[in-house]
Design a protein with these regions (language model features):
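N-terminal first-folded block
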Residues: 1-26
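Short, flexible, glycine/charge-rich loop motifs used to bind or transfer phosphoryl groups or to couple energy/partner
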Residues: 15, 38, 58-59
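Short beta-strand-to-turn element immediately C-terminal to the catalytic PLP-Schiff-base lysine
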Residues: 27-28, 51
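Short alpha-helix capping/helix-loop boundary micro-motifs
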Residues: 32-37
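C-terminal structural segments of small proteins and small subunits
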Residues: 49-80
Length: 80
């Protein structure tokens, strides 16, 4: 899992059927920017928890994704 900050969103006018209804966010992890499927209603500026890889795909009903926002972080003990 990774912690990051939502810095934008991605709008797709056409996408695969299995991605219909998914909202995508751009998340800065401090090392790279990732596009992640939003599962919790996060917004720009929110600190979020991401899951990546196969787990993200399984979390989203096996959609072809490799990152998903699974929590909005209120506090993380002062660590990035």
């Amino acid at each position: 899992m990774k912690i990051g900050k939502v810095i934008g969103s991605v709008w797709a006018t056409r996408k695969a059927q299995c991605l219909q209804g998914q909202r995508f966010l751009v998340v800065d992890t401090g090392r790279e920017d990732l596009v992640a499927a939003d599962q919790v209603g996060a917004g720009i500026g929110d600190k979020v928890l991401l899951t990546t890889g196969t787990v993200a795909s399984r979390y989203c009903m096996d959609a072809p994704i490799d990152a998903a926002v699974v929590a909005i972080v209120d506090e993380n003990g002062g660590h990035r």
